[in-house]
Regions:
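Bilobed periplasmic-binding protein-like "clamshell/Venus-flytrap" ligand-binding domains
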Residues: 23-50, 101, 142-178
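Ligand/substrate-recognition segments at binding pockets and active sites
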Residues: 3-9, 13, 25-104
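Flexible loop/turn segments at secondary-structure boundaries
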Residues: 52-54, 84-87, 105-109, 121, ...
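Short, solvent-exposed loop/beta-turn-alpha elements that line the ligand-binding surface or hinge
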Residues: 1-14, 29-40, 88-93, 111-140, ...
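Sec-exported extracytoplasmic/periplasmic mature domains
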Residues: 17-26, 66-73, 91-95, 100-103, ...
């Protein structure tokens, strides 16, 4: 694209100012100077980093906070030593912003998080018949191509609501010693949901 990192960051900040302005914030000389009714120039984001930044999203939050400060917005990071404080705040609907990691089941069912009657509905407060229908269509059909298309539509729906920003996807790694294990006996195509433990009875030692 021909842009340096500094140019990319500058363009991102300009875009951020545009989004803030579209949301009703007052922008003067490249700085946020006033917030619209119901909004603020400062927000707290909770993250369970053990009080020492031990979380995959902590670095991104820190960089975002530093960048936003240059345009007049204060993103305060509350790195919690006790993660239950954040979940209590979520359940009482007092958390302004927060970082967490969702774990999916073996079957990538979106019901547990995104359906209005799912266990985490109160975290996002999305009560949409359209989204509920997409989630139910996906979880009640065994055709993988169909499910993929339906879930993509549902995820696009969620992105449009802007209730979450996907940051990373965790991957697992399994390490075996070729001196101790017959690698030909290790299951092939291991995934997060299908590990060597699923066929551990077939693994042979050298």
């Amino acid at each position: 694209d021909g842009m340096s990192d500094d140019e990319k960051y500058a363009a991102a900040l300009d875009a951020a100012l545009g989004f803030f302005e579209a949301a009703g914030y007052t922008v003067t000389d490249g700085k946020l100077t006033a917030a619209p009714a119901g909004a603020k120039l400062s927000y707290e984001v909770m993250i369970g980093g053990g009080g020492k930044g031990d979380h995959p999203s902590f670095g991104i939050l820190t960089a975002a906070s530093e960048a936003l400060k240059t345009i007049g917005f204060d993103l305060t990071i509350n790195d919690l030593a006790d993660g239950t404080i954040m979940w209590d705040a979520l359940n009482s609907e007092t958390a302004e912003m927060w970082c967490a990691a969702w774990q999916a089941t073996l079957d990538p069912d979106m019901f547990q998080i995104y359906h209005s009657e799912g266990g985490s509905a109160n975290y996002y407060a999305i009560y949409s018949d359209e989204l509920d229908e997409l989630v139910m269509e996906g979880r009640t059909n065994t055709d993988q191509a169909f499910r993929k298309a339906v879930y993509k539509e549902a995820l696009d729906f969620i992105v449009d609501y802007a209730v979450e920003i996907p940051v990373y996807q965790r991957q697992n790694a399994s390490v075996f010693s070729t001196q101790r294990v017959n690698v030909d006996s290790i299951p092939q195509d291991l995934t997060t949901f299908y590990s060597y433990l699923n066929e551990i009875e077939k693994i042979q030692m050298n």
